């Protein structure tokens, strides 16, 4: 109801304004005829009447009023025309604004529909899945270097054949590259291992003089293993001891509990060193045995012999 009432009021106002505008235009048209008739009347009265001064003054007053009315009519008509034009321009601009709002809403609806359609299509589309494969250049064989150069573009091998092929290739590379030797003891020396062919030279140490034996005992080739509290220091100490007979001395070295456990290769080298030491000590044993036999039948005239043996 209020919308229809406003519409009716708007129509009534517009009709009144249009009627006033038409009346103003009609008055302007009638004003021309009135001015012409008034001019003819004053012309006749000026020629026939004796009182010409009164006729002239009356003509002046009428002309001024007619001019004022004409200007008033022209101003009112101009105002009405401008008001009508402004009103129509406002209506046109308002209509354009409404049309632009409707177009914007349509664009937003279209974009939203396109977005929803793409999202639904992305959920429906089933993307193809390809198997991940290792591609080698022509003429190359899978080795350890080639395995490092391969680029893997997936997280898992889905095909069973590909997985078996890859596993066989890895096994082949593992068989080709032997594992490095594992050290059994961390306390083992970093010196080069004693070659086995030198063990044959120990059988001839009994015929070598004592000075040459002392010189060779310092050689690193003869005693390759050097450790804290090592065998080399104990062997040098045993060589520097005087050759006096002692029952408590034994050939086998004493093994201390704090000494780390040695590997099998170290034991073999140590046994060879013990064998060499026993061979070096054989002349001194025979010397001590001879001295012990002579000491039982010691006389004053044998003192020179004992001193000679001690010096020897």
From Swiss-Prot:
Keyword field: Cytoplasm, Cytoskeleton
GO cellular component, one term: cytoskeleton
UniProt biased composition (Low complexity): 183-199
Function: Involved in regulation of actin and microtubule organization. Part of a WAVE complex that activates the Arp2/3 complex.
Disordered, as annotated region: 173-287
Principal place of residence: cytoplasm
Compositional bias (Basic and acidic residues): 269-279
Polar residues composition bias: residue spans: 230-251
Coiled coil: none
Domain of life: Eukaryota
Cellular location(s): Cytoplasm, Cytoskeleton
Assembly behavior: Binds SCAR.
Name of the featured protein: Protein ABIL2
InterPro entries attached to this UniProt entry: ABI
Gene3D superfamilies found in the cross-reference section: 6.10.140.1620
Family according to the record: Belongs to the ABI family.
